[in-house]
């Protein structure tokens, strides 16, 4: 019996070694090589919800659907686009907490093996997603903040390896204060933005990108602000039209 148990353990160990490979010791594989899905290319926003807040500038005081606390509502009620324009703050609604809701296009490429770059034609913004990056200790990193990325792989069954597919998870901090909506609905420098990017390929070959965004801001929000935004992949950049930020 002892011999039989030993043999079973040896076979099991050998199988596990073959399945998972040798113990880790070398450098980690770059993020580009371990990507569970291809997010690169041109993507156009599909405005299928929240039309009145995304396609036109809402009226002052229209912050339905955003869990503002009293401080957030008070600040939103003071919105003055002319003051933003005079101060050079036309990009307040194009920051990391809101840019996915701005109608337009994304262009996603790899800047290097561990940095994914997302550009927008609306507002001409650039975001960098750093795999294995560390958040700075202080200071703001501009409208797009500092983003740390990771692959959120699907779990495998039992003791198996991760299953196929997965999401890109991005956590952004150190953001310059801005607007969740163009009519002055605020978020502060303390906001934390967590995003999940998922690519979907339909049987007919059409490809879509779904971005789930969660904004936490203890200064102006009484709860988490959650949105889900959809994009469709385009064959090339023929319709790419960079435009400047607009305050209204």
Predicted regions and their residues:
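PEST-like low-complexity, intrinsically disordered acidic/proline/serine-rich tracts
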Residues: 17-248
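Cleavable N-terminal signal peptides
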Residues: 5-6, 16
């Amino acid at each position: 019996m002892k011999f039989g148990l030993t043999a079973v353990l040896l076979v099991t160990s050998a199988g596990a070694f073959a399945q998972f490979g040798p113990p880790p010791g070398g450098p980690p594989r770059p993020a580009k090589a371990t990507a569970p899905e291809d997010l690169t290319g041109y993507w156009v926003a599909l405005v299928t919800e929240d039309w009145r807040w995304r396609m036109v500038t809402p009226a002052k005081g229209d912050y339905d659907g955003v869990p503002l606390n009293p401080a957030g509502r008070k600040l939103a009620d003071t919105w003055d686009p002319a003051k933003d324009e005079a101060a050079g703050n036309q990009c307040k609604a194009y920051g990391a907490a809101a840019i996915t809701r701005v109608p337009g296009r994304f262009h996603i490429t790899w800047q290097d093996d561990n940095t994914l770059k997302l550009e927008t034609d609306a507002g001409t913004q650039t975001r960098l997603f750093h795999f294995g990056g560390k958040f700075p200790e202080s200071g703001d990193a501009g409208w797009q903040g500092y983003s740390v990325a990771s692959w959120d792989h699907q779990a495998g069954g039992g003791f198996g390896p991760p299953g196929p597919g997965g999401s890109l998870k991005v956590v952004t901090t150190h953001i310059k204060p801005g607007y969740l909506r163009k009519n002055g609905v605020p978020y502060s420098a303390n906001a934390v933005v967590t995003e999940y990017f998922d690519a979907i390929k339909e049987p007919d070959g059409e490809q879509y990108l779904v971005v789930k965004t969660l904004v936490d801001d203890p200064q102006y929000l009484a709860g988490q602000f959650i949105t889900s935004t959809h994009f469709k992949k385009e064959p090339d950049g023929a319709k790419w039209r960079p435009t400047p930020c607009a305050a209204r």
